[in-house]
Design a protein with these regions (language model features):
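An N-terminal RHG(E/S)-centered segment typical of histidine phosphatases
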Residues: 1-70, 85, 89-93, 220-241
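Acidic, low-complexity terminal tails and accessory targeting/binding regions
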Residues: 1-3, 16, 21, 104-130, ...
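GST-like fold's C-terminal all-alpha helical module
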Residues: 157-173, 177-185
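Phosphate-coordination/substrate-recognition cap region in phosphate-metabolizing enzymes
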Residues: 43-136, 206
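Active-site signature of alpha/beta-hydrolase-fold catalytic machinery across serine-
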Residues: 86, 190-194
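Beta-strand elements within well-structured catalytic alpha/beta cores of enzymes
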Residues: 2-6, 73, 177-183, 191
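Phosphate-handling substructures
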Residues: 12, 16, 25-29, 33, ...
């Protein structure tokens, strides 16, 4: 299995945080949309997945005719669905939503006076069916919002990362599948540490730019991290963190 972890395109929250002003929590959306720049980024990403080289400048396969993605998953957060939908459409694939791929914390609002984080329902099945009719949804998604639980503490994301890795291995391990997952920067740190068998980085970060790609190859009894945070295909004018 070749695994391609892709961070979503720029969201409105990402754009606000670049400004680093005192009103960020007030303007923050629990489930932000993509910005106009983010919409440009997804077009660049989709075309690169279709016709770019998956090798990251390495001389490995000599493949310059696209990534050959066979399966594509995304979280149920709107910014990830929008990103994944553009890629899936360009590749002629069915996009499958996977709730566990969500960002650390889940869907929540911040109470400015106390900085308390309160979990929210999130969009329900009808919302996704209307807005993203070709998205394959989990059977468990109903008329209630897909989140509908308290704020997820960072420590609670660790077993979720393990669960994602185990499911990917069960579904695609030992095959030639090329799997793309469209997810989030905070969760990527958790997920990569899980793959490496490394302690979680309590006071550290692993950068992934918007629409950056990280590739991990899984073999019969070993794996290799081919690259992390690949951004060479993103034009400077649309590059964002």
């Amino acid at each position: 299995m070749q695994l391609y972890f892709i961070r979503h395109a720029q969201s409105t929250n990402n754009a606000y945080w670049i400004q680093q002003d005192a009103d960020n929590d007030l303007r923050r959306s629990p489930d932000p949309e993509l910005t106009d720049l983010g919409c440009q980024q997804i077009g660049v990403l989709a075309k690169f997945l279709r016709s770019g080289s998956p090798d990251g400048g390495q001389i490995t396969s000599g493949n310059n005719g696209g990534f050959g993605i066979t399966h594509i998953y995304c979280s149920l957060m709107v910014r990830a669905v929008e990103t994944g939908a553009a890629a899936a459409a360009e590749l002629g694939l069915l996009l499958t939503a996977w709730a566990d791929l969500h960002e650390v914390g889940g869907i929540y609002e911040v109470i400015p006076e106390t900085e308390e984080r309160i979990g929210l329902p999130g969009p329900n099945r009808a919302y996704f069916e209307e807005r993203f009719p070709s998205l394959r949804l989990p059977e468990s998604l109903n008329d209630k919002g897909w989140w509908s639980r308290p704020f997820e503490k960072p420590d609670d994301a660790v077993p979720r990362a393990e669960r994602i890795l185990n499911v990917l291995q069960d579904r695609h391990g030992g095959t030639d599948d090329r799997v793309a997952v469209v997810s989030h920067g905070g969760f990527f740190k958790m997920f990569l540490c899980q793959i490496l068998g490394a302690p979680q980085l309590r006071n550290g970060w692993i950068s992934m730019a918007n629409t950056a790609i990280s590739r991990i190859n899984f073999h019969a009894d070993w794996f290799d991290v081919a690259y992390v945070n690949r951004t060479d295909f993103i034009p400077p004018q649309v590059y964002t963190l």
